[in-house]
């Protein structure tokens, strides 16, 4: 089908309306946290069972051989034990209110066996449903109670919002998320250039081989040393370099005797004969290795290339000599010693450390094929037939999501648990139920979740910051952003973080990682967010793929020949060779139609690669060929397209092997390019945060990046905020949907939980109070509720009993009450009454701490008191009982209106702080009497180039008088992008407005007409959580530090603002020396010391110098910190003098 006919059919099937319905159905079906939930479900259903089943037996050899075996592993739904010892279901909302962890039991059946060595029959007993650990359960997963109900039922019954898609955990009442971690791909050879200490660039082909079953990993490298191709192998825990020809011979493939069959292993063109001959010569140059290779030492190979025909003892002796000699040559350069190498060491090195991912059941033919493939790729890269691999290419990366991270941690803790079991069994025969219930798995997992340190103590590698609080809880958008975050962790030596390449945008990340949403500063380019359509594979094991290929009878046993090397391709399944086949064999592999599987033909390397490992980025995409060939009626549904294979998921390997159109017009603008795939939506290149920016293609990239950071700090409306008890949370009182929005915001219900207001914004210089980044606000608009917010602070008190210390919630006696505190607002139960107005010094919860030491009871009042800045009214009280102890939470709400110094920003990253609040009478007004809510400075537009704000203002102005849906569409890359502004201005004129969006305005102070017209219209603005009330502090006097006698630092400590070196220099150049003396001395740490005028030393008395005996001692003023400095210098043996 030619390009014109193809486009005609695609225009019909993939019209803009159909594509919009398909994309909307995609988000309705998959949501935004599917990658988190799916991987956790995979861990629960398969990963957890695999870890325990691999080492299900715990044995202890003694007089009576004692063993435990775990069977029938499963995870229970979260539950809680009440005070009356009844077990009931635990729901997320209750876990939040009671500061509990939302955990479920990992239960097993335990078979206990005791074998008597005296010949008696073994004693076998079995216990059922024995819990060995409690693990946190992800909300929305298969073992979460919320999965039993529909979203509407969850909101009505369980207090869980329909917009909350889950994907996070609840630990001690706090919502925490596992941040996905990027790592290098396993079992995939990568050629790169490495700089050595001699400042020479060395080409290396490296593969990190990781076994799927045992997780044993090692690195195999192919490189050239002194014109010889070498393989780095681990022998007795140290790396040695062995010529690749020797390794082939040790594996039973003698290059000298195999002839042309050895050449067919590499499947290289004739010009590479010299390299293959060099590999053959590695086995023939006996003098280079100091060993005598006789004819009896050689290997006779049969037609299949397997060694045979020689005595096994001679073959082993020859192999040992080779490795010993190579070890000796390495030792001369400071390497390992040659002593103690046996045939068992060599055998272990070849079987365990040479591609362990192939498994112990693999043949040496598979190791030879894979090693030959690495050598082939190395030679092709060396001769520049193929480019050097970029290690920052996402083709060579994988991402570890919640399921993989959980699996990694549980595996480490389970191994530690097994060692603990053996230790306790050695001491005594345990009570199985109590013994397993107190395992350290639960403690270790909860510690990792709480601290963010992901690993086991004393382990070589512990990642930090993996578990983070879902914070700030200011809007639904910030919640989604944290759940889709991806981090590239720093290397152990930290060198990668200093390079700029790792932080730059790589082309392979298109439509997988958002190019916009990344923080400023240290995390730029390493803290990323997934694109909206991006998903992550859960993985299918290599053995399952091989079984499917065998069951379908695909013949992969053909043999390569020199005559036709291009049509004989090596099949690699996750880096494991699985035979050879002609190029047309890929058509017989189409039955492997699974989201987790990708098949790619790489003719340059002569290989068919099948990837099914976990952690690959994938995205849905239109298959244009199948859509064009489809006969029948199209149903515009994502699920229907996916079921009919008109949409399929591709990973980076498949994306690189296909020609992908961004949108339909690419087919006509590039007629010479044959496109076989097309993106679902051009805006799919953005993440969920950048996807809500109107016209992001009409502003500079930095503005989009800044907005992605600021909008997550914008105060909005959090679902079910009245049921949650966060430590600090904010709520916008009158949120509004944006007039100009994007499709992604509509599809994901973000406009149902808005975080801004459509304010009337004028761009003008007015009185100078809006210079630079300042803005002017209308006081009447504020009085009507503009940007009014409520800040909720939660105070918690819990009863405890720990040894000699007991804490009770009760009213303390008058003898121990805290002075200057108001106890009049609390009720008889010791808790403040609802709807009370509280201020600094008021008691919210009365609590008494009882210390019983040496039979003496001491009572201390430890009540919860309102501090400065926490004033407000009692919004709600949560009173619960856990294990017989009360836990009380009091939520204080504080109404906050905008004030000078508060921070705001527009929906296009025009940030600013409030510089002045004018009454409406002083604000400029139009002929119709309209006054702006906000006035911003015109200088902010040329420097920041936020043209999208101008377009959005014009579009919003038009939409208020002509509510046509296309006049609120702020999507980027629209088909009418070049003419949209002209069209908007034309419709503005038709509706009686100036086509430029400007207005004639009059001064609010004089009533005179302002000579220039002013651009004014509705613009979506956010109020950020950075408020003056939380940050401003000052003091005249108060507490000082003990050591330096200077004022405390910090607002919470009653401290002041730091007067630093730069502030000192500013005052000094103005000549205000008396003010400088007041700031840095009189109001800081004034002190007087006695100084001898003769010797200049500090004296301990004012009558006589104890250094020189002089009576000429004078008292002088000096900062106390300076006195400390002089004394510390004297203590180090440095003599200091003061000249008076």
Curated annotation (Swiss-Prot):
Stretches annotated zinc finger (C4-type) = 1092-1108
Protein EC: 2.7.7.6
Q: Where are the transmembrane segments?
A: none
Record-level GO BP terms: DNA-templated transcription
Report the GO molecular function annotations.
DNA binding; DNA-directed RNA polymerase activity; ribonucleoside binding; zinc ion binding
Name the UniProt key words of this record, in alphabetical order: DNA-directed RNA polymerase, Magnesium, Metal-binding, Nucleotidyltransferase, Transcription, Transferase, Zinc, Zinc-finger
**Record-annotated residues binding Mg(2+)?**
773
Q: Which GO terms describe its cellular component?
A: DNA-directed RNA polymerase complex
Quote the SUPFAM superfamilies the UniProt record gives.
beta and beta-prime subunits of DNA dependent RNA-polymerase
Catalytic activities = RNA(n) + a ribonucleoside 5'-triphosphate = RNA(n+1) + diphosphate
Query: Looking at the record's lineage, which domain of life comes first?
Result: Viruses
Residues that bind Zn(2+): 1092, 1095, 1105, 1108
According to its UniProt entry, the function of this protein is described as:
Component of the DNA-dependent RNA polymerase that catalyzes the transcription of DNA into RNA using the four ribonucleoside triphosphates as substrates. Second largest component of RNA polymerase II which synthesizes mRNA precursors and many functional non-coding RNAs. Proposed to contribute to the polymerase catalytic activity and forms the polymerase active center together with the largest subunit.
So what family is this one in?
A: Belongs to the RNA polymerase beta chain family.
Protein name per the record: Probable DNA-directed RNA polymerase II subunit RPB2 homolog
Q: Which organism is it from?
A: Invertebrate iridescent virus 3
Q: Which lineage is the organism of this entry classified under, starting from the top rank? A: Viruses, Varidnaviria, Bamfordvirae, Nucleocytoviricota, Megaviricetes
């Amino acid at each position: 089908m030619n390009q014109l006919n193809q486009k005609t059919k695609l225009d019909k099937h993939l019209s803009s309306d159909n594509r919009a319905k398909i994309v909307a159905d995609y988000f309705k079906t998959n949501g935004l946290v599917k990658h988190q939930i799916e991987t956790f479900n995979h861990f629960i259903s398969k990963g957890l069972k695999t870890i325990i089943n691999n080492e299900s037996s715990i044995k202890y050899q003694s007089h009576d051989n004692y063993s435990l075996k775990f069977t029938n592993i499963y995870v229970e739904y979260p539950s809680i034990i009440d005070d009356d010892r009844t077990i009931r279901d635990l729901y997320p909302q209750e876990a939040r209110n009671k500061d509990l962890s939302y955990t479920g039991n990992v239960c097993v059946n335990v078979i206990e066996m005791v074998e008597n060595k005296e010949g008696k029959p073994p004693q076998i007993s079995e216990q059922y449903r024995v819990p060995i650990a409690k693990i946190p359960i992800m909300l929305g997963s298969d073992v979460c109670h919320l999965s039993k109900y529909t979203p509407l039922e969850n909101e009505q019954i369980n207090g869980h919002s329909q917009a909350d898609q889950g994907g996070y955990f609840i630990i001690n009442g706090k919502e925490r998320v596992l941040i996905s971690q990027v790592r290098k791909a396993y079992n995939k050879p990568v050629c790169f250039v490495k700089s050595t200490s001699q400042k020479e660039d060395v080409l290396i082909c490296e593969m990190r081989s990781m076994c799927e079953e045992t997780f044993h990993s090692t690195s195999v490298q192919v490189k050239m040393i002194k014109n010889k191709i070498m393989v780095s192998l681990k022998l007795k825990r140290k790396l040695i370099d062995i010529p690749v020809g020797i390794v082939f011979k040790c594996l039973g493939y003698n290059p000298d005797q195999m002839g042309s069959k050895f050449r067919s292993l590499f499947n290289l063109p004739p010009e590479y004969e010299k390299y293959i001959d060099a590999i053959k010569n590695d086995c023939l140059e006996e003098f280079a290795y100091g060993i005598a290779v006789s004819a009896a030492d050689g290997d006779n190979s049969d037609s299949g290339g397997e060694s045979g025909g020689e005595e096994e003892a001679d073959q082993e002796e020859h192999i040992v000599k080779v490795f010993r000699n190579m070890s000796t040559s390495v030792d001369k350069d400071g390497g390992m010693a040659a002593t103690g190498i046996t045939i068992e060491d060599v055998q272990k090195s070849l079987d365990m450390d040479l591609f362990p991912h192939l498994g112990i059941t693999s043949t040496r033919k598979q190791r030879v094929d894979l090693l030959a493939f690495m050598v082939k790729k190395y030679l092709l890269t060396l001769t520049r037939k193929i480019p050097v691999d970029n290690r920052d290419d996402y083709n060579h990366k994988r991402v570890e999501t919640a399921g993989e991270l959980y699996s990694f941690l549980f595996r480490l803790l389970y191994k530690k648990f097994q060692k603990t079991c053996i230790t306790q069994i050695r001491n005594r025969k345990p009570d199985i139920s109590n013994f397993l219930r107190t395992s350290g798995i639960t403690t270790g997992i909860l510690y990792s979740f709480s601290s963010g340190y992901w690993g086991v103590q004393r382990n070589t590698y512990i990642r930090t910051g993996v578990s983070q609080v879902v914070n700030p809880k200011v809007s639904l958008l910030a919640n989604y952003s944290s759940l889709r975050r991806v981090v590239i962790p720093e290397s152990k030596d930290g060198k990668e973080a200093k390079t700029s390449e790792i932080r730059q945008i790589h082309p392979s990340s298109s439509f997988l990682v958002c190019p916009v949403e990344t923080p400023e500063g240290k995390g730029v380019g390493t803290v990323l967010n997934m694109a909206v359509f991006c998903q992550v594979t859960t993985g299918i094991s290599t053995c399952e793929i091989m079984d499917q290929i065998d069951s379908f009878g695909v013949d992969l046993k053909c043999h390569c020949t020199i005559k036709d090397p291009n049509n004989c391709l090596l099949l690699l399944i996750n880096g494991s060779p699985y035979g050879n086949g002609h190029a047309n064999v890929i058509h017989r592999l189409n039955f492997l139609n699974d989201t987790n599987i990708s098949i790619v033909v790489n003719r340059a390397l002569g290989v068919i690669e099948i990837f099914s490992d976990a952690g690959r980025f994938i995205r849905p995409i239109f298959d244009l060929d199948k859509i064009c060939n489809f006969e029948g009626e199209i149903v515009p549904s994502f699920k229907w397209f996916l079921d009919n294979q008109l949409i399929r998921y591709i990973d980076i390997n498949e994306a690189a092997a296909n020609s992908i159109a961004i949108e339909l017009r690419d087919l006509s603008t590039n007629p010479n390019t044959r496109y076989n795939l097309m993106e679902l939506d051009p805006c799919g290149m953005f993440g969920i945060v950048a996807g809500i920016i109107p016209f992001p293609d009409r502003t500079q990239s930095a503005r989009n990046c800044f907005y992605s950071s600021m909008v997550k700090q914008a105060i909005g409306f959090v679902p079910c905020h009245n049921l949650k008890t966060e430590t600090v949370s904010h709520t916008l009182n009158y949120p509004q949907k944006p007039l100009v929005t994007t499709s992604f915001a509509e599809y994901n219900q973000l406009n149902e939980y808005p975080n801004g207001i459509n304010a009337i914004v004028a761009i003008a210089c007015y009185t100078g109070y809006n210079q630079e980044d300042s803005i002017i606000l209308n006081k009447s608009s504020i009085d009507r509720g503009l940007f009014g917010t409520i800040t909720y602070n939660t105070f918690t008190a819990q009863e405890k009993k720990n040894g000699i210390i007991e804490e009770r919630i009760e009213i303390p006696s008058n003898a121990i009450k805290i002075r200057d505190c108001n106890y009049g607002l609390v009720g008889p139960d010791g808790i403040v009454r609802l709807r009370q107005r509280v201020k600094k010094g008021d008691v919210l919860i009365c609590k008494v701490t009882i210390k019983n030491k040496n039979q003496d009871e001491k009572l201390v009042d430890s009540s919860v008191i309102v501090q400065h800045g926490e004033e407000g009214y009692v919004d709600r009280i949560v009173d619960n009982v856990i294990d017989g102890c009360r836990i009380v939470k009091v939520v204080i709400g504080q109404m906050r209106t905008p004030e000078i110094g508060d921070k705001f920003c527009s929906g296009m990253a025009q940030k600013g702080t409030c510089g002045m609040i004018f009454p409406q009478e002083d604000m400029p007004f139009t002929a119709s009497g309209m006054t702006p809510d906000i006035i911003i400075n015109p200088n902010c537009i040329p420097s920041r180039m936020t043209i999208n704000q101008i377009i959005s203002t014009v579009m919003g102005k038009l939409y208020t008088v002509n509510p046509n849906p296309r006049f609120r569409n702020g999507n980027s890359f629209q088909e009418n992008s070049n003419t949209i502004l002209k069209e908007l201005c034309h419709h503005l004129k038709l509706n009686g407005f100036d086509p430029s969006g400007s207005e004639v305005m009059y001064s609010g102070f004089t009533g005179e007409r302002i000579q220039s017209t002013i651009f004014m219209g509705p613009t979506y603005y956010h109020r950020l959580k950075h408020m003056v009330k939380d940050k401003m502090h000052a003091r005249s006097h108060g507490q000082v530090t003990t050591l330096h006698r200077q004022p405390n630092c910090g607002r919470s400590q009653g401290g002041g603002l730091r007067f630093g070196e730069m502030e000192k220099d500013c005052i000094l150049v103005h000549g205000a020396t008396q003010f400088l003396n007041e700031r840095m001395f009189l109001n800081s740490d004034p002190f007087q010391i006695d100084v001898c005028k003769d010797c200049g030393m500090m004296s301990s008395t004012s009558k006589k110098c104890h250094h020189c005996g002089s009576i000429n001692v004078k008292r002088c003023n000096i900062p106390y910190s300076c006195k400390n400095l002089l004394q510390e210098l004297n203590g180090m043996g440095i003599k200091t003098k003061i000249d008076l």
